[in-house]
């Protein structure tokens, strides 16, 4: 996965926005094409919304493209904030949460994958791993129950490597077993993609 080969905050933000509600295999070609069109945060901020939507076309959930464009423009206008790999300033969780289209998970994922900050992430594959091991006979497992285990397990781990390993393991479980995430109180079956 190309976003695992970078710590560039801009490229991490692009990947996290694209991966919302969309599977990795579907995102990969769009991610590469989008970054060819908009290789830097400055290029995206300077681009028109029409060009951004054109580059996003076919991925679906086009509101994410609009939010990404708005978020990067907003970040570009903030003093002491730059989305570039050479700029050492980390963006605070609270500032990330104020951006359009950036929820709790995306803000924490940005901090983990761009700056190796010790946040604790819960997403579908991580949820599957914890449910499989700690709640094998429980239905309607809430994320707050998983969070206690996730916080303890994440201690003294490299944040990036730990979360990537959990994501990969959870994805493996979902392919080889009945999806453990179905026991989550947050589970909702997605309909098949039919264009956008």
What are these model-predicted stretches?
Residues 1-195:
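Catalytic cores of DNA base-excision repair glycosylases
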């Amino acid at each position: 996965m190309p976003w695992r080969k970078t710590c560039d905050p801009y490229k991490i933000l692009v990947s996290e926005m694209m991966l919302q509600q969309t599977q990795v295999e579907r995102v990969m070609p769009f991610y590469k094409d989008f970054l060819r069109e908009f290789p830097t945060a400055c290029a995206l901020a300077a681009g028109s919304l029409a060009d951004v939507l054109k580059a996003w076309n076919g991925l679906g959930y086009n509101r994410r493209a609009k939010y990404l464009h708005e978020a990067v423009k907003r970040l570009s206008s903030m003093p002491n904030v730059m989305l570039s790999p050479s700029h050492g300033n980390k963006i605070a969780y609270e500032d990330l949460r104020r951006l359009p289209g950036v929820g709790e998970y995306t803000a924490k994922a940005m901090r983990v994958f761009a700056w190796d900050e010790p946040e604790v992430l819960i997403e579908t594959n991580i949820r599957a791993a914890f449910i499989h091991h700690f709640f094998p006979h429980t239905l309607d497992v809430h994320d707050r129950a998983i969070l206690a285990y996730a916080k303890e397990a994440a201690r003294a781990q490299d944040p990036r490597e730990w979360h990537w390993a959990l994501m990969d393991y959870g994805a493996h479980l979902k392919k080889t077993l009945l999806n453990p995430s179905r026991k989550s109180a947050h589970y909702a079956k997605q309909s098949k993609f039919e264009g956008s």
